Amino acid sequence: MLEKKELTFVVFILHALGQHWNMTTPEVYDILNSTGILDDYIIKCYDVLHTLGKEYLVEDITEFVREKGIEV
C-alpha cells in the first residue's frame, strides 16, 4: 500500500506526463502500468525521484517509455 506522500508523487507524475504527452491521466497511467515503469521505477525509486525537478522527471520517464517501445 502506498503512503500518502508516494501517492501524491505518482499523481504529480501522471499529470506532468499527461500535459507533456497531450494525453489524459488514465492514458498515462495505462502506459506506465503496462510497461512496469510505475511499480518498478517510479514507486520503487520514490526516495530518489521525488528530489528531482519536474522537467528532468518528464524527460527521464519519457525516454524510459520509448526504450520500452512505446511512442509518446
Residue ranges of predicted features:
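Amphipathic, hydrophobic secondary-structure cores in small proteins
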Residues: G18, T24-L49
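N-terminal acidic leader/helix
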Residues: L2-E27
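Long, compositionally biased
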Residues: Y46-V72
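Short amphipathic alpha-helical segments, especially helix-boundary/capping motifs
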Residues: M1-E6, T35-D39
